[in-house]
Regions:
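Flexible, acidic active-site loops/lids enriched in D/E/S/T/G that coordinate Mg2+ and/or position polar
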Residues: 1-48, 55
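Hydrophobic residues within well-ordered alpha-helices
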Residues: 133-136, 157-162
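Active-site neighborhoods of divalent-metal-dependent phosphate/nucleic-acid chemistry enzymes
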Residues: 141-150
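Acidic beta-strand-loop-alpha-helix segment within the catalytic core
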Residues: 43-132, 179-207
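Alpha-to-beta junction loops
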Residues: 137-142, 165-166
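A short, glycine/Asx- and small/polar-enriched loop/turn
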Residues: 15-19, 88, 136-139, 177-179
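Conserved G/P- and acidic residue-centered "switch" motifs that form tight phosphate/ATP-binding loops
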Residues: 29, 58, 160
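Acidic, metal-binding active-site segment of PIN/NYN-like and related structure-specific nucleases
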Residues: 3, 7-9, 164-181, 186
Length: 207
């Protein structure tokens, strides 16, 4: 007996430690609708409050990203890892706009500005699950976004940690499933991103 938490259905059962499938059948919906080939299926399996397995599939590029707790991460069957980037200098960072929380736009843009000035470049592809997968596999050095949903994060967050990266909420803790706020990357990039986010904490934390 399993539970399902999905963007299209919500909880089907809760309240115990049996496996919960956390599913986003189409991450990057706007891209899909407009014919932009950047979207994915994201599936995580949690036992209790920990995601134990995750898979992200890009049906256009035929990429499959997998992770299991304690066994590492793979990209199309080959082990993958985050980059060795020691900090934001020279880093390629991914992000997403706070389209679900317009009240965060001003603090987000302040954070964006500081990250932009500190790194090599920023990309906003429009599918958070793939942003996390690409961070895990070394295409991006880090990622940050406000107000994501559990199905956006479940598989990708596990991928990043199993690939040697660091994940946290905007305060540096582990409550990103509850808050929907994610900062991740190589250890050094994560630390630099978190430092910038915290500079503006009074602005976004009050919203």
């Amino acid at each position: 007996d399993h539970a399902v938490l999905a963007e299209e259905s919500g909880w089907t059962r809760r309240g115990d430690d049996r496996p919960t499938w956390i599913v986003d059948p189409l991450d990057g919906t706007t891209n899909f609708v407009h014919g932009i080939p950047q979207f994915a299926v994201s599936i995580g399996v949690a036992v209790g409050d920990r995601v134990e397995h995750g898979v992200i599939v890009d049906p256009v590029k035929r990429d499959v990203f997998r992770a299991g707790r304690g066994v590492g991460a793979t990209w199309n069957g080959r082990p993958c890892s985050v980059t060795s980037r020691p900090g934001l200098a020279g880093a390629l960072v991914a992000t997403g706009f706070p389209f679900k929380a317009h009240e965060l736009l001003d603090p987000y843009l302040a954070i964006f500005r500081d990250v932009f000035l500190a790194c090599k470049a920023i990309r906003r592809p429009g599918a958070a699950a793939l942003d996390l997968a690409y961070t895990a596999c070394g295409l991006f050095d880090g990622f940050f976004e406000f107000r994501l949903s559990p199905w956006d994060l479940a598989a990708g967050a596990l991928l990043v940690t199993e690939a040697g990266g660091v994940t946290s909420d905007m305060d540096g803790g582990g409550d990103f499933f509850a808050t929907g706020d994610m900062v991740c990357g190589t250890p050094g990039v994560h630390a630099d991103l978190l430092d910038i986010v915290q500079r503006h904490r009074d602005r976004w934390h009050s919203e």
